[in-house]
């Protein structure tokens, strides 16, 4: 629970926002008087609603402040001589002191808490926009993702672009793309679009567009994604034709009646997945195809690897039930854990990387995939790791350490200069 000082500070902040909101209302009134069209009328109505909302928050905060002050005045009268708070069931005072009262009124336990997304609603919403604004937003959440998230954490933001508009009574009105930027305490609605859900959905809906524009998340670029993606078609075809260690008998479906291959194993896996495919997954693919999206059909599709260019968070729902795709995403999640472990073992690296000693991309990916209705075949992940793991690890970006001779020369100059100007011990470079 907030302290009296925090409540007063929050009231002051909202009062400052209210002054600005009321000024915007006045500006909108002047604009509407000058040009009384529907667009200006809507703008005036929106700004009045914002001002009323802020005023409502201020009134609520003032009520909370008054309640806290009243509770503080009565606390001495209500306290039991034993030191127990009213309503406490203990017979003797606990060794622990009383802490905050946690308000649960805003929680609804019947609502999803972010574990399961309503992918059909999300895909329907996203495909209602033109492709340019979606790809530009993806750029802001991949290439510039860290800064965008940092600047807007804990808020619901809107992306706008001239390519995205809708006609309202013959008036061209901008159509904004809404996204939520949660913090650690946020509880997401089932159809609420977070950066992770957005990257997952867009990369699954438009993999060829993502590939053409090279839209890669920084967390993917440092784990050798480009090294595997640059010759993906040849790489995956070669891998599919390799003898499969998981099938000992000759394949009955092979044209040459030769040894079973990885392709044969994935065909078996596809048959099992076809029986597991959920109605929601079928509806998501159908709507995406009807909306004009070019979805991948097989792991050997030219753009299939690019569905994971956004991040190793989860497998997109548009390719979840394609044999090998969910496991390919899990392979990238394992690579991310491997790189974080390597960085934590080094003497260099950012403080954030050093803290990631217990990296859990894979466990998170596994949990999310299970919540979407599929169990990973970890034997396929083993095949990926055996055939591509070393090449990916050799392509990791681990940060270049300084040459020992260069470091020694630089440190000597630092030591000399520090001794000239200070009595302190020189720091190490």
Swiss-Prot record:
Region (Chaperone activity): 1-100
Bilayer-crossing regions: none
One GO cellular component, as annotated: host cell Golgi apparatus
Main location: virion
Gene3D superfamilies reported in the protein's UniProt record: 1.20.58.90
Superkingdom of the organism of origin: Viruses
Entry's Gene Ontology molecular function annotations: endonuclease activity; RNA binding
Chain coiled-coil ranges: 4-31
Span(s) of short sequence motif YxxL: 178-181
EC number: 3.1.-.-
Pfam families per UniProt: Hanta_nucleocap (PF00846)
InterPro entries to which the protein is assigned, alphabetical: Hanta_nucleocap (IPR002214)
Annotated region (Viral panhandle binding), positions in chain: 1-175
Region (Interaction with host UBE2I/UBC9): 188-191
Region (Disordered): 27-46
Location of region: Interaction with glycoprotein N: 80-248
Domain observations: The N-terminus is required for chaperone activity and, in trimeric form, this region likely serves in high affinity vRNA panhandle recognition. The N-terminus also contains a coiled coil region, which probably participates in but is insufficient to initiate N trimerization. The YxxL motif is indispensable for the interaction with host MAP1LC3B. The central region is involved in specific RNA-binding. Has distinct cap- and RNA-binding sites so it can bind simultaneously both the vRNA and mRNA cap.
Functional description taken from the UniProt entry: Encapsidates the genome protecting it from nucleases. The encapsidated genomic RNA is termed the nucleocapsid (NC) and serves as template for transcription and replication. The nucleocapsid has a left-handed helical structure. As a trimer, specifically binds and acts as a chaperone to unwind the panhandle structure formed by the viral RNA (vRNA) termini. Involved in the transcription and replication initiation of vRNA by mediating primer annealing. Plays a role in cap snatching by sequestering capped RNAs in P bodies for use by the viral RdRp during transcription initiation.
Protein name, per record: Nucleoprotein
Biological source species: Dobrava-Belgrade orthohantavirus (DOBV)
């Amino acid at each position: 629970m907030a302290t009296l000082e925090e409540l007063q500070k929050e009231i002051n902040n909202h009062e400052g926002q209210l002054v600005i909101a009321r000024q915007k209302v006045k500006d909108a009134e002047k604009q509407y008087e000058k040009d009384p069209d529907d667009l200006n009328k809507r703008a005036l109505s929106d700004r009045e609603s914002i001002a009323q909302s802020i005023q409502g928050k201020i009134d609520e905060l003032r009520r909370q402040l008054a309640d806290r002050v009243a509770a503080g005045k009565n606390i001495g009268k209500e306290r039991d001589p034993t030191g127990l708070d009213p309503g406490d069931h203990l017979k003797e005072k606990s060794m622990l002191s009383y802490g905050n009262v946690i308000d649960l009124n805003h929680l609804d336990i019947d609502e999803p808490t972010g574990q399961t997304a309503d992918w059909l609603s999300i895909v329907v919403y996203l495909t209602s926009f033109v492709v340019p604004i979606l790809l530009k937003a993806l750029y802001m959440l991949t290439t510039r993702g860290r800064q965008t998230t940092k600047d807007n954490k804990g808020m619901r933001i809107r992306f706008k672009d001239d390519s995205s508009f809708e006609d309202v009574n013959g008036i061209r009105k901008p159509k904004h793309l809404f996204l939520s930027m949660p913090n650690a305490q946020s509880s997401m609605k089932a159809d609420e679009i977070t950066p992770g859900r957005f990257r997952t959905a867009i990369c699954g809906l438009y993999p060829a567009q993502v590939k053409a524009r090279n839209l890669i998340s920084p967390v993917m670029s440092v784990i050798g994604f480009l090294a595997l993606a640059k010759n993906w078609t040849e790489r995956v075809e070669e891998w599919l034709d390799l003898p499969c260690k998981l099938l000992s008998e000759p394949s009955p479906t092979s044209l040459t009646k030769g040894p079973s291959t990885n392709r044969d194993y994935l065909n078996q896996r596809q048959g099992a997945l076809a029986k597991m495919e959920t109605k929601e997954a079928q509806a998501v693919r159908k709507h995406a195809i009807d909306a004009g999206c070019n979805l991948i059909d097989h792991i050997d599709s030219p753009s299939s690897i690019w569905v994971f260019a956004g991040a190793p968070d989860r497998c997109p729902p548009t390719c979840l039930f394609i044999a090998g795709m969910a496991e390919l995403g899990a392979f990238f999640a394992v690579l991310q854990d491997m790189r974080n472990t390597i960085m934590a073992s080094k003497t260099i690296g950012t403080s954030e990387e050093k803290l990631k000693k217990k990296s859990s991309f894979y466990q998170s990916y596994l949990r999310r995939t299970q919540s979407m209705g599929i169990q990973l075949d970890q034997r396929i992940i083993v095949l990926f790791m055996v055939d591509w793991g070393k090449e990916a690890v050799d392509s990791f970006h681990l940060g270049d350490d300084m040459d020992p001779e260069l470091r020694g020369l630089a440190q000597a100059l630092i030591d000399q200069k520090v001794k000239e100007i200070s009595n302190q011990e020189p720091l190490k470079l």
